[in-house]
């Protein structure tokens, strides 16, 4: 098997998960979704984060509404399953690590600015079918995985990378799931 830089980095992250001890989350506040500003238009070009993601990730040129601020159609690969989507109204932009989960694993004390950065981080945003997003909800990696193995392995690697990037706790049950699943994934 040929190893890419991403594969090697994922292996390093997986190895560190096996030996590191999870840190207890200091959850002192209740999760309130409105405390996490999302779909921001930080560059003030009338395209919010959702529109930016749809435009950037389309496999074809997108069609926009008359004002040019909302994406109508394009061609997107689903992150969780081997499907292609063509209508923007039929897809969700999902937070790979759900906002509520981040809140419960170390982000509860973040500033509003830090929460906004996380909620709009393209690395944590994926395109998927609405029903898959609803099935996943705020579940962690120990409660939900894509059914398709190839997609599960990428999901695990991205989950670990984002947890590491944002210094979020990997719960003991997550670690157990990661340890058992990484044997099936070829990193």
Write out the residue ranges for each language-model feature.
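Domain-level detector of nuclease and nuclease-like folds
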Residues: 71, 76-187
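Sec-dependent signal peptide recognition
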Residues: 2-10
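C-terminal motif of bacterial Sec signal peptides marking the signal peptidase cleavage site
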Residues: 15-16
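N-terminal module-boundary/linker segments of secreted carbohydrate-active enzymes
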Residues: 20-47, 174
């Amino acid at each position: 098997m040929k190893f890419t830089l991403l594969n090697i980095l994922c292996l390093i992250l997986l190895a560190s998960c096996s030996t590191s001890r999870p840190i207890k989350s200091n959850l002192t506040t209740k999760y309130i979704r409105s405390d996490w500003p999302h779909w921001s238009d930080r560059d003030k070009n009338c395209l919010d984060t959702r529109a930016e993601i749809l435009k950037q990730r389309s496999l074809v040129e997108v069609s926009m509404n008359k004002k040019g601020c909302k994406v109508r159609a394009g061609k997107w690969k689903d992150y969780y399953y081997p499907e292609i989507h063509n209508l923007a109204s039929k897809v969700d932009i999902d937070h790979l690590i759900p906002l509520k989960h981040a809140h419960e694993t170390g982000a509860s004390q973040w500033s509003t600015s830090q929460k906004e950065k996380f909620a709009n981080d393209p690395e944590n945003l994926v395109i998927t079918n609405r029903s898959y997003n609803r099935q996943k909800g705020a579940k962690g990696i120990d409660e939900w995985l894509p059914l398709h193995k190839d997609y599960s392995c990428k999901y695990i690697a991205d989950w670990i990378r984002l947890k590491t990037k944002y210094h979020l706790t990997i719960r003991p049950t997550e670690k157990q799931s990661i340890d058992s699943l990484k044997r099936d994934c070829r990193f």
